[in-house]
Amino acid sequence: MTRLLLLARACLQGLMCAPAALTAAPPTGLMTDLIEHTDRVWINGYPTQMTLEEAARSIEPVQMALIYNRRPMFSWVLNDVRPDVKQTFAQIQVGTSREQLSRYRSDMWNARFENNDNSTTVIYDGEPLKPNTVYYWKVRTDNNNAQQDWSEIRAFRTADTLYDYKTAYYPQVKSDERPVSVGRLPGGDLAVDFGRASFGQLVLTLDAQQADTIIVRIGEALRDGRLDRKPDGTIRYREHKLALLPGRHTYRIKIMPDTRNTRNTPPLAVPMPEYVGEVLPFRYLEIEGYKHDIAPADIERQTVHYPFNDFAVHFTSSDTVLNRVWELCRYSVKATSFAGIYVDGDRERIPYEADALLNQLCHYSVDREFTLARRSHEYLLNHATWPTEWILQSVLIAWYDYLYTGDIRSAEANYSLLKHKTLSALEEEDGLIVVLNNPKVDSALRDSIRLPQNQKLDDIVDWPRGEFTFMPKNISPNVFHYASLELMGKLAGAMGKKADSAAYASQAARTAASINKYFFDKKSGLYRDGIGTDHVSVYSNMFPIVFSLVPPQYQPRIADYLVSRGMDCSVYAAQFLLD
């Protein structure tokens, strides 16, 4: 799915989409700890006009993105679209007064960076920041040694407690939406369509001559032109009786919690914040017993999501189907961000590492802000799920986080935990890991990888599980074990941990050699599912080729095999198949 979005990345990162006049401009898109709108204040999920200073005097509960780090990181968009231009100098000023900073007076930090092209990971190194304090900063650059104007001033507020490292994040917010169509069904019921589904709440403005009762039905799916009242699986449907008051009134349809996705026992469901309230995914609405006319303006869906820039990227092609697929991918990232952490949808509202990996890669392609991916990753580091491969994928997520942000701080802060996530404790002499009936899968191991004691560690391969023959030692977890070792070596190198980097590289090489020795069948030219079976599958062959484990002379045979099988896997595994 994410590969459909690759064409948008260049525009997203400011590398293409230049205006007609190739000119320089002051830096824009200023971020503090990867948050752009640090100066924005919300009330109950809606943006306000308040400044950070005014928010401290508000009688209503307010929400904002706080900065938790003693030494936050600054970044900006160079905003110079002329060819062959690079930043050659930067100056940052940080102060406690907007007025003073506008006069180029900075009482916290005034840093000059000569011969420097870093515009993404500049770490604060001024006077100690205080908790619960508003600060201001701005930046200017020289591009090809030509001085540019100062940026606008950006404000941020520190949290009540400051840390050596803690990820900043936005509150969940609301967007009000109106239906795309309103009509009557045979029999007179109102039928409303919002055009696409979202996680939200419903507000209706209705008229009544006298006290009356109507039935409001909301859901995700239609059957024979009507709302499906008994949908399959975890497709949602709700029915509410609403007592009307005489006159014209606005009613909020209260969404009640579902015990299937609001449990507070491990594995924990991610709760909705009190200022937002409970939500339900729905697209369609039916109202029974309401005889008055109703305008689209009287029907409001309050969609809940993580802050998202709908105009950060643009994609179009001559293929209308491809355009629709791209828009589906883009919108899905926004729509499924309702919990403030990547979750599995409304089924359990639980994060899973594999889901987070796919969400992460897709999200990177459709917006400029990456804190939702990082926050989800760090949550999962401490709330692991049961599949062997998905625990190993924590290291992949950490690597992509560093690759796309250039910010190594999250990996540094979680380095010890990431080391455990490689599952090196389960390695045998050949460098391969095995989970089934392994006495090393004990309470100490579960604690080390943050897996609940009541959870069984088990190989998954795919979900739903496809055509794969499970053995005690399977290729799928071992390929991801190799990938985690290789990427831990790269992360260690980025941190300057040379000895660790070399050790992980050596460990990865041993595992790679064993994968090719024990799983590859020279007779068929394909990789087996596990040691002890001759069965081969899409999974056992696509995972090795994705992570460059296949020697060049065997790649054509495996490629032909994968093409012959088509999309013989789930949406999750399709990510790797497309890779």
Question: For each of these PLM feature ranges, what is it?
Answer:
Residues 99-100, 345-351:
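Glycine/proline-enriched, intrinsically flexible loops and inter-domain linkers
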Residues 351-358, 362-579:
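Active-site core of glycosidic bond-cleaving carbohydrate-active enzymes
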Residues 25-134, 138-339, 355, 371-372, ...:
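Extracellular/oxidizing-compartment recognition motifs
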Residues 268-269, 340-345, 464-469:
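Flexible glycine/proline-enriched surface loops and loop-helix/loop-strand junctions
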Residues 311-318, 346, 362, 471:
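Second-shell loop/turn segments in exported
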Residues 223-244, 341-346, 491-496, 519-530:
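N-terminal short leaders/motifs
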